[in-house]
């Protein structure tokens, strides 16, 4: 099937095409790969190469990205299994929404810290006080998971929120995290719709078959 034929069939029956896409593994490999890329970028580029110590919100964001990976792996076991798909989608939506919230909170802290810096002659004292007052070195992960003890290099906060000055095209790390989560959600929404449509169709077919 050519690309033009794919687009024509998608235009004619978008929900059916989404149902087919979400029932196969490739799209979920993409989701897992994207989340792994974000995690590895944070660890190897920002933490190791740029020597930027992760803050409390940063490790929470890593946790949410790890949840996206786990959600994708659950679905990849069998994308056609409704129980696995439900568990995976619930975890993925939780991780994306919560990750966006943590990123938004980090952005607000970053803005507040740098606002204090702009009004102070002492950059390090002002940024440290503003960021440190909003962050903790003892994170509280969901379900009480001691990830900072199990994997301290990845999940133990050693920096203050908002202390970094990294920016690209005028946007800081928190902004890009918000964009990443928003992109995840925009992509997951039609896949969720496709799965739900497929689930309801299968259910109706089962009911019709049982009533014959």
Swiss-Prot record:
Keywords: Cell inner membrane, Cell membrane, Disulfide bond, Electron transport, Membrane, Oxidoreductase, Redox-active center, Transmembrane, Transmembrane helix, Transport. It is found in: Cell inner membrane. GO terms for biological process: protein folding. It comes from the Bacteria. The chain crosses the membrane at residues 27-49, 59-76, 83-102, 177-199. Disulfide bonds join 55-58, 135-161. InterPro entries: DiS_bond_form_DsbB/BdbC (IPR003752), DsbB (IPR050183), DsbB-like_sf (IPR023380). Its main location: membrane. GO terms for cellular component: plasma membrane. GO terms for molecular function: protein-disulfide reductase activity. It is a multi-pass membrane protein. Required for disulfide bond formation in some proteins. Part of a redox system composed of DsbI and DsbL that mediates formation of an essential disulfide bond in AssT. Interacts with DsbL. Belongs to the DsbB family. DsbI subfamily. This is Putative protein-disulfide oxidoreductase DsbI. It comes from Shewanella oneidensis (strain ATCC 700550 / JCM 31522 / CIP 106686 / LMG 19005 / NCIMB 14063 / MR-1). The lineage of its organism: Bacteria, Pseudomonadati, Pseudomonadota, Gammaproteobacteria, Alteromonadales.
């Amino acid at each position: 099937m050519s690309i033009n034929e794919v687009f024509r069939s998608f235009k004619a029956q978008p929900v059916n095409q989404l149902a087919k896409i979400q029932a196969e593994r490739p799209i979920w490999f993409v989701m897992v790969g994207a989340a792994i890329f974000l995690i590895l970028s944070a660890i190897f580029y920002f933490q190791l190469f740029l020597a930027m110590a992760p803050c409390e919100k940063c490790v929470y964001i890593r946790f949410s990205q790890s949840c996206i990976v786990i959600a994708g792996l659950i679905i990849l076991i069998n994308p056609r299994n409704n129980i696995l798909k439900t568990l995976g989608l619930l975890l993925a939506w939780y991780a994306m929404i919560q990750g966006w919230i943590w990123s938004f909170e980090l952005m607000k802290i970053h803005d507040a810290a740098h606002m204090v810096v702009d009004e102070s002659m002492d950059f390090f004292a002002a940024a440290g006080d503003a960021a440190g007052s909003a962050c903790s070195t003892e994170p509280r992960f969901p379900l009480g998971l001691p990830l900072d003890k199990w994997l301290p290099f990845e999940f133990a906060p050693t920096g203050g929120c908002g202390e970094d000055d990294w920016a690209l095209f005028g946007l800081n790390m928190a902004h890009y995290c918000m964009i990443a989560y928003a992109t995840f959600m925009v992509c997951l929404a039609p896949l969720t719709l496709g799965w739900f449509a497929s689930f309801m169709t299968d259910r109706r077919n089962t009911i019709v078959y049982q009533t014959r």
